[in-house]
């Protein structure tokens, strides 16, 4: 079934300029709708780890993008206090008390999750925003005013602190989603965008900005890397001087690495403050 879906969606993507809400074959509409439904249930996901490496299911990302071409904007009620006008309904628009109980997560008003996002058991959504295609795994806290971008992959027992921004793939169009692996802590007002991967058990301090062009400086080795935070890293904001010493530019600094056992025993503040 997935292979047939993929073929229909790949073909539709190649001819996307011909698609509109009023001009789309029935099989394309059905395939895109089914893909979004499976993303919403967590049965399919845009990226998954296989044999230790993250593999992006590009056809599912295409399905998310195609869904915007196939739907018209429509009024959407917002609990009596306002009204929205959009193409993607709320994930919880038709939820009953039984549906919420079966889901096993908390949604604190006015948190928003779009249909096509997956929210696992024991997740807490404080007043925050989770976009279509995102996957938020068990036990994760999405704190107040945090945003989880389209198709972003958030692991188990992650804490996204207040105001954290996790980038999406839709605007601007990105090749790969942001991935935050299990047991990570992302500090307040930090931003992780452009398909950066933060590996498991890492701690990102407050106000750290990570994109594909951000230099990641390892204090222990002196190495500079891009696009990936190694497992167990403790990261703070910093600067690297230019070769001529005339200026410095922003970077992220890996100040230490800890194993999962240390991460579990030691408080976050102690990890960030220690030498």
Curated annotation (Swiss-Prot):
Domain of life: Bacteria
Encoding gene, per UniProt annotation: dapD
GO molecular function, one term: nucleotidyltransferase activity
One GO BP annotation of this record: lysine biosynthetic process via diaminopimelate
Alphabetical list of InterPro entries matching this protein: DapD_Trfase_Hexpep_rpt_fam (IPR005664), Hexapep (IPR001451), Hexapep_transf_CS (IPR018357), THP_succinylTrfase_dom1 (IPR023180), THP_succinylTrfase_N_sf (IPR037133), Trimer_LpxA-like_sf (IPR011004)
Sorted UniProt keywords: Acyltransferase, Amino-acid biosynthesis, Cytoplasm, Diaminopimelate biosynthesis, Lysine biosynthesis, Repeat, Transferase
Reaction catalysis annotation: (S)-2,3,4,5-tetrahydrodipicolinate + succinyl-CoA + H2O = (S)-2-succinylamino-6-oxoheptanedioate + CoA
Protein name as catalogued: 2,3,4,5-tetrahydropyridine-2,6-dicarboxylate N-succinyltransferase
Annotated CDD domains: LbH_THP_succinylT
Pathway in which this enzyme or protein is active: Amino-acid biosynthesis; L-lysine biosynthesis via DAP pathway; LL-2,6-diaminopimelate from (S)-tetrahydrodipicolinate (succinylase route): step 1/3
Keyword check for Cell membrane: no
Cited PANTHER family: 2,3,4,5-TETRAHYDROPYRIDINE-2,6-DICARBOXYLATE N-SUCCINYLTRANSFERASE, MOLYBDENUM COFACTOR GUANYLYLTRANSFERASE
Record HAMAP family: DapD
Keyword match Acyltransferase: yes
Main location: cytoplasm
Cross-referenced Pfam families: Hexapep_2 (PF14602), THDPS_N_2 (PF14805)
Transmembrane segments: none
Native species: Paraburkholderia phymatum (strain DSM 17167 / CIP 108236 / LMG 21445 / STM815) (Burkholderia phymatum)
């Amino acid at each position: 079934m997935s292979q047939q879906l993929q073929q229909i969606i790949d073909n539709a993507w190649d001819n996307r300029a011909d698609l509109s809400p009023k001009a789309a074959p029935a099989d394309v509409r059905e395939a895109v709708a089914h893909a979004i439904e499976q993303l919403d249930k967590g049965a399919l996901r845009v990226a998954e780890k296989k044999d230790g490496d993250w593999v992006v299911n590009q056809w599912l990302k295409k399905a998310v993008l195609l869904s915007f071409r196939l739907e018209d904007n429509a009024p959407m009620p917002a609990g009596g206090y306002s009204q929205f006008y959009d193409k993607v309904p709320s994930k919880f628009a038709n939820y009953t008390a039984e549906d919420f109980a079966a889901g096993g997560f908390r949604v604190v008003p006015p948190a928003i999750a779009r249909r096509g996002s997956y929210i696992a058991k024991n997740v807490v959504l404080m007043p925050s925003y989770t976009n279509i295609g995102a996957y938020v795994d068990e036990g994760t806290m999405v704190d107040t005013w945090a945003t989880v971008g389209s198709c972003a992959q958030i692991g188990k027992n992650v804490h996204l602190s207040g105001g954290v921004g996790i980038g999406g793939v839709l605007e601007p169009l990105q090749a790969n989603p942001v991935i935050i692996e299990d047991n990570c802590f992302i500090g307040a007002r930090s931003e992780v965008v452009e398909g950066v991967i933060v590996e498991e058990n890492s701690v990102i301090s407050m106000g750290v900005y990570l994109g594909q062009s951000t230099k990641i400086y390892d204090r222990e080795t002196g190495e500079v890397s891009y696009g990936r935070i190694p497992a167990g890293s403790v990261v703070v904001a910093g600067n690297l001087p230019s070769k001529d010493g005339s200026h410095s530019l922003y970077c992220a600094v890996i100040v230490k690495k800890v194993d999962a056992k240390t991460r579990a025993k030691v408080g976050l503040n102690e990890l960030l403050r220690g030498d």
